[in-house]
Each structure stands twice: as C-alpha cells, then as structure tokens.
Amino acid sequence: MERGSRDHHRDHRDHREHRELREPPTLAFHMKSWKTINKPLKAFTKLLKENTTVTFTPQPSIIIQSAKNHLVQKLTIQAECLFLSDTEHFLTKTINNHIPLFESFMNIISNPEVTKLYIQHDSDLYTRVLVTASDTCTQASVPCVHGQEVVRDSGKSPLRIDLDHSTVSEVLKWLSPVTKTKRSGKSDAFMAHIIVQVNPPTIKFVTEMNELEFSNSNKVIFYDVNNMRFNLSAKNLQQALSMCAVIKTSCSLRTVAAKDCKLILTSKSTLLTVEAFLTQEQLKEESRFERMGKQDDGKGDRNHKNEDGSALASKQETQYKITNYMVPTKNGTAGSSLFNEKEDSESDDSMHFEYSSNPKRQRCVV
C-alpha cells in the first residue's frame, strides 16, 4: 500500500516536470510565405506607426491595428502565412507595436535579415518574442495589453462598390493637392466628400478644389447602391486608400449604418487583408459639398433625403481610441533598436503620387 502511494506521487511529479519542460505554445511564420510579403509589410510599417497594437490569435492570425480620430486601420496576416504548434492552449494575446529592444513589431516582421520569429505563450501577463537574424539571436518578454477591442466588420451593408487598383491610385493622385499641405485643421478645405447616387450608378469624390466622378465600368463595379453621402477627413481618406493600394488588389467600399455610420474600405490577397474604418466628420458650416447636395436633391428622388450623410453624422460620437497604455514616441518611432535602418522616403516602398490640379469637373467613364 505504501509502495503504491510512493509510485503514484513519483508519477505525478514526473508528469508535472514534463509539463514544465514542455515547449510553450508557439506561433511562427512560414518563411517561404513570409518572404513574399516582406516588401508590402515594409510599406505598412510606414503607415502603421502611432497608437498601434498587435494581436495574436489561435486561428492562427496576426492583427495589427492602428487608431486615430475618425480612422481605424487594420492589417491581418492570414493563417496561410503562419504555423501554430498548439491551437488548444494558445490564447489570444495583445501587445503594443512598440518593443524597445526591436523598435517595433512591424520593424521585426518587415526586416529581410530575420530568419526566424517565434511568438510564445507561457504567461497571461506577457508575450515572449524570439528573433533570429543573420548576426543576432535574442528574445524579449513584452507586457500584454488587456481589454483592447479589435474592430470587426459586422452587419449587412446597403452599399458595395469595388474599385480596381488603378482607380484607387487615380483617387490618391487626385487627393494629393489637398493632403500635401502642411497646414492642419477641420475647415472644409481639408475635407473630402463622397457622394453615391443610384440613377445612374455613380460615385463622386469632392473637395473644395475639384471633384472626380466614376460611373459603372470594368474598373468600378456597383453591386449594392443607395443614395449616400460621407463627410471625411481628406488625410484620413488618403491614408485608408494608401493602405489598400499597397497589396495592389481591388478595393471594396462598404458601409455599416448602425450606431456610428462607417465607411469601410477592404482589400484582400491570399496572405494579407487590409481594412480601414472611417467615421464621418461634422461640418460646422455649409460647404460647397452641401450646396451641391441640395441641388442634386432637387433633381433626384426626394425620398432619399433621410439617407443624407449629414443626418447620420450626429451619431459619430463613439470613436475607437488607443490611449493611456501607448508608449510615447517621437514622430511615431522610438530611439534605438537592433534593426536600426534609416527609412528613405523616396524608396520604392513609399507611396508617392504627383497630380496636376485642374479646376474643371472631371468625369471618368471606361
């Protein structure tokens, strides 16, 4: 009897020691797939700097999310690019993008010199990041961020318009004169307005300087259309479109007219998904856009007045913000890191557009 008890305790101790020595659940990149998205990731590093968190999920996936006023941007690295050793015991974990030893998580995954990257779950309080490069092998225990919400696209959309990559690039060039100015403010000169009309199906991009219009074609496809208007920050719209332009696929425009009406831009590839959630800005005074809208309402169906974006704008109080736990940085970057590369703003990875302003109204039909 006594011998059996000793054997039982010994087996229990051996099992506990084996469990403690066992490798913790580990998330890693498939290196072959990772190398194919290295260049897009480097471009995203320049677009996702401030107020950015990284979430690891057991699907597996990696979600990088950045929040600012009236704009949330999300980059998802899909399961086809990842390997997870233990899906049962790996729990969803969120950390800051800023990692002092490496500068940022985005800086790690976009560095071509990295040969191995492991994310390990062995504590609810922190995430262990192990990095191997050509001349270094190191690890860091990064504190977890708790209670951070990942913004998700939910609900049926009354609007869906697909723009091909060349059209997205054209809109970015057209926005350039407004967004290049060094002044800042919420005056109408810094606003971009989007008008969607049903008959005939058209989408207009309007600023105080100019406007751009597209009708149904093989480059701009209207699936679900309703008369709608959006008042957006021109810089927010430019940044959202720049995110979608990186992976060079079509960009889908949708909306969720719920608690806070959002314009959702989505672009997808096999390994990456980009989403941008824009909420409307409130206009303090009647703008050229509003005056033009009143003229359009006189020509169109009066029943669509209730769908005016200005009526929905009053619902835009809830904003997704990342606040007190973020690490303050200078110009969106930290001081030192193992991968201390200088960014060249004129490199091939930069999103750089030139556009000559034309005061006349433009209409694009293919």
From Swiss-Prot:
GO annotation terms (biological process): DNA replication; viral genome replication
Superkingdom of the source species: Viruses
InterPro entries membership: DNA_clamp_sf, Herpes_PAP
Chain intervals for the UniProt region annotation (Disordered): 1-25, 286-366
Family matches, as Pfam families: Herpes_PAP
Gene3D superfamilies: 3.70.10.10
One example GO MF annotation: DNA binding
Composition skew (Basic and acidic residues), residue ranges: 286-308
Keyword Phosphoprotein: yes
Sorted UniProt keywords: DNA replication, DNA-binding, Phosphoprotein
Polar residues composition bias: residue spans: 313-322, 330-339
Composition bias type Basic residues, residue spans: 1-16
Similarity comment text for this entry: Belongs to the herpesviridae polymerase accessory protein family.
Function (record text): Accessory subunit of the DNA polymerase that acts to increase the processivity of polymerization.
Name under which the protein is recorded: DNA polymerase processivity factor
Species of provenance: Human herpesvirus 6B (strain Z29) (HHV-6 variant B)
Upper lineage: Viruses, Duplodnaviria, Heunggongvirae, Peploviricota, Herviviricetes
